[in-house]
C-alpha cells in the first residue's frame, strides 16, 4: 500500500526547472531551498504559486499546502552542505519528530534542480528528552483526546511491555454513516503493514531450505510474462526495496482495477516495466516488489499467499481477527475508510483494492498486532538469527531491513512498519531492548495517529 504524503523513512521527490541568467552564487542551491521553505512555512498560496512560476515548477501549490498541513511547517536544524550546485539541510516538521534531510541539486548552469526529502536519524542534540513512563502515557492520552475532540483522528492505540498492556485507547467512529463507534477490538486497514507478514513468510521458507534470498526471482516464477524485466533481480532486493521495480498505483492500476483480484493478475498490468536502475544499486520503495514476493510464496509453498500467511503466521501467533478478505465480503466490525475532502471526512472506496495483497491492504486489530509482536519476540515465527537479519539495516540508506522499517542502535533500536493511504494510518513498532510493542490504527488519513505513536517511541525511557 502506498505511503500517503510523508511517512517515516519514505522518499518524496519533487522536481523543477530553474532558469537562472546570472552566474551561480556560491550558495545558490541553498538560496533556492530556503526560498521554498519560507514560502512553504507561510502557507501562502499566492506566494507559493509565484515561487513556482518564477522557477518554472509545475503548478502544484495545492500539494505544497497539503504537505504543509501535514507537517505544520519545517524547522531548519542545521546545514549539512551548501555549494553552488547542491545544498542539504536537516529539517524537522513542527507537528512531529520525523527528522528529514532535504537536498537540492542544480546543474552546472543552474537550470535544473531536484528537491528530495528523505528520513534521517537525528543527531543526539536534536533528539527529544526521554520521559518517565506514567507521565509519557498520560501525555499520549491527552494528545489523542485532543485530536479526537477536533475530529482529527479515529482509531485505536496500544502500548505493551513484555506482553502486558500498559495503555489502551480507542475513540471516534468506525462507521460515521451508521454511527458505530470504534471499539477496542475494531479491525482497521493496515496499508503497508502486510509487508512484514510477507517478509516473515519468505524467511520461514528460507529456514526450511526451500529458497535462498540470493535466488533470482525468475527462478521461482517460470511463467512470468516478461522475464527480461526480472534479469538480475533477487529475492533479497525485493525484500529491501533495492530492485528498481515500481509501484502498483496510478492510471494503469485505476484502468485495470476490476481485473486485479489475484496476485498473478498484477503481472498482466505491471510486468512490462523494467527496473528503473540496475537492481541492487539504489533504494526505491517498491510495492510491486512485494506483489512478486507474494507470488514466490505461492510458487514455493504450493498454497495461496492468503492460506500460507493464515496457517504459518496468523494461527501460530493467535491472530484471529487478521486477514485480507475481498471488499465484497462482510468482515464484522471492520472500520470504514474516510478521507478529507473540502475539510470534511468522506467515505473512501475508490482507492481500495479488490482485496489486500502481499504488499498491503489487509486488516487487523491492535490486539492481534500485539500478538504478532510477541510471536516475533518469543521466536514463534522466526529464529533469532532470521529476526535479527530482518530487523537490521539491509539497504543503502539503512532505513529498511527485510520487510521491516528500522532505525536506531542499541537501546534506541526500533523495528516495525508504517502504512498510510487515503482513509488509513497504521503503525506497528517493536522496541526490542525495552520489550515494548506500540500499535496505532486509524481509519482516517495520516499522520495524526502515526505522530502519537512516534511521540511515544521517541520518549520511552531506555
Where are these regions (language model features)?
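Active-site helix/loop module of the DD-peptidase/beta-lactamase fold
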Residues: 189-193, 205-246, 250, 272, ...
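Short active-site loop at a secondary-structure junction
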Residues: 148-156, 178-237, 277-288, 357-360, ...
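Catalytic-site signature segments of enzymes, centered on catalytic residues
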Residues: 170, 185, 249-331, 356-370
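Positively charged n-region of N-terminal signal peptides that target proteins for export
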Residues: 1-5
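Short solvent-exposed beta->alpha transition segments
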Residues: 31, 35, 40-90
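Catalytic loop of the DD-peptidase/beta-lactamase superfamily, centered on the K-T-G motif
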Residues: 21-26, 30-33, 92-169, 298-311, ...
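Bacterial N-terminal signal peptides
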Residues: 7-15
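The feature captures the short pre-catalytic strand/loop hairpin that immediately precedes
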Residues: 137, 264-276, 340-354
Amino acid at each position: 500500500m502506498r505511503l500517503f504524503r510523508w511517512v517515516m523513512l519514505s522518499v518524496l521527490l519533487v522536481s523543477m526547472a530553474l532558469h537562472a541568467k546570472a552566474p551561480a552564487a556560491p550558495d545558490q542551491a541553498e538560496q533556492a531551498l530556503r526560498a521554498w521553505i519560507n514560502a512553504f512555512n507561510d502557507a501562502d498560496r499566492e506566494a507559493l504559486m509565484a515561487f513556482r512560476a518564477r522557477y518554472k515548477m509545475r503548478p502544484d501549490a495545492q500539494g505544497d499546502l497539503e504537505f504543509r498541513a501535514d507537517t505544520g511547517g519545517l524547522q531548519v536544524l542545521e546545514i549539512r552542505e551548501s555549494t553552488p550546485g547542491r545544498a542539504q539541510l536537516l529539517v524537522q516538521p513542527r507537528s512531529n519528530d520525523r527528522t528529514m534531510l532535504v537536498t537540492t541539486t542544480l546543474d552546472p548552469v543552474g537550470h535544473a534542480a531536484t528537491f528530495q526529502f528523505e528520513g534521517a536519524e537525528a543527531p543526539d542534540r536534536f533528539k527529544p528528552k526521554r520521559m518517565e513512563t506514567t507521565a509519557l502515557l498520560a501525555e499520549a492520552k491527552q494528545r489523542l483526546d485532543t485530536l479526537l475532540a477536533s475530529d482529527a483522528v479515529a482509531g485505536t492505540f496500544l502500548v505493551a511491555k513484555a506482553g502486558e498492556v500498559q495503555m489502551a485507547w480507542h475513540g471516534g467512529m468506525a462507521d460515521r454513516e451508521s454511527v458505530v463507534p470504534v471499539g477496542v477490538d475494531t479491525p482497521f486497514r493496515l496499508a503497508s503493514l502486510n509487508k512484514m507478514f510477507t517478509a516473515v513468510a519468505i524467511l520461514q521458507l528460507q529456514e526450511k531450505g526451500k529458497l535462498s534470498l540470493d535466488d533470482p526471482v525468475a527462478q521461482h516464477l517460470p511463467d512470468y510474462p516478461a522475464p527480461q524485466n526480472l534479469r538480475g533481480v533477487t529475492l533479497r532486493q525485493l525484500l529491501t526495496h533495492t530492485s528498481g521495480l515500481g509501484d502498483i498505483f496510478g492510471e494503469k492500476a485505476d484502468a485495470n482495477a476490476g481485473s486485479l483480484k489475484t496476485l498473478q493478475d498484477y503481472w498482466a498490468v505491471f510486468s512490462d516495466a523494467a527496473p528503473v536502475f540496475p537492481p541492487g544499486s539504489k533504494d526505491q520503495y517498491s510495492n510491486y516488489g512485494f506483489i512478486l514476493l507474494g507470488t514466490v510464496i505461492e510458487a514455493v509453498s504450493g498454497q495461496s499467499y492468503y492460506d500460507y500467511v493464515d496457517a504459518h503466521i496468523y494461527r501460530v501467533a493467535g491472530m484471529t481477527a487478521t486477514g485480507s478478505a475481498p471488499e465484497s465480503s462482510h468482515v464484522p466490525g471492520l472500520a470504514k475508510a474516510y478521507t478529507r475532502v473540502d475539510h470534511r471526512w468522506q467515505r473512501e472506496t475508490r482507492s481500495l483494492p479488490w482485496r489486500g495483497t502481499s504488499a498491503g491492504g489487509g486488516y487487523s486489530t491492535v490486539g492481534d498486532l500485539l500478538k504478532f509482536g510477541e510471536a516475533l519476540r518469543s521466536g514463534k515465527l522466526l529464529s533469532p538469527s532470521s529476526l535479527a537479519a530482518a530487523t537490521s539495516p539491509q539497504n543503502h540508506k539503512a532505513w529498511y531491513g527485510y520487510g521491516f522499517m528500522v532505525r536506531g542502535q542499541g537501546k534506541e533500536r526500533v523495528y516495525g512498519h508504517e502504512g498510510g493511504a487515503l482513509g488509513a494510518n497504521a503503525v506497528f513498532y517493536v522496541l526490542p531492548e525495552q520489550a515494548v510493542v506500540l500499535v496505532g490504527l486509524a481509519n482516517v488519513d495520516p499522520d495524526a495517529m502515526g505522530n502519537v505513536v512516534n511521540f511515544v517511541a521517541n520518549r520511552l525511557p531506555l
